[in-house]
Amino acid sequence: MAKVHPNIRVPDQPCITSIASQQQEPPVVLTVWRKSLLFNCHGFTVFDANGNLAFRVDCYASSTRRAEVVLMDVAGKPLLTIRRKRLSLADSWVIYDGDGATTPLLSVRRHVGLRASKALAHVTPLSSSLPLPDAYVVEGSYGRRSCAVRDARGEAVAEVRRKESVGDDVFRLVAEPRLGAPLAMGIVIAIDEMFRGGGGGSSARSLLRRTCSD
């Protein structure tokens, strides 16, 4: 990780839909640190390729069954609200734009099945403003720090990759422009909330299970 402390300048954050529509740009590579920069607070601190602060998540609640997590920009402005769906047969979360007051963007539902499967969760777009296919599947192993969000053709639109020699609290998140870095991070947060209890075998162990519970 090039830097721990962010630059003072607050970068402009493009809207979610414009990020998702920029399909000709290279992937965004982020470094995710399982720690909040705020004292006595748990969460994520996310850096861009230059070591500048890109996103943050600050969790004050220590509950293992949180109802809501907010992804913020450098200045603390809500970019996405990840909210648990009530009365769902499977563990399901909905990702909303901004402070979560109106626009649902994606649904992330935990995979449930009797047969062994590489699938951990299913992601479904909920907004026509997102130029995305009908569905994604999250596959891989959190225990190995290796998982991917794949489209119907099996192509990865986001990947969690192990970052060597820095311990388990730091990893890479690679996001393709058609999904966008904020939505990719939102999916990671939802997956973490589903699996941080450690249930479901080795493939279901949460890579980030200590993020908001250490």
What are these regions (language model features)?
Residues 1-66, 74-77, 90, 103-214:
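Low-complexity or membrane-interfacial segments used for flexible interactions
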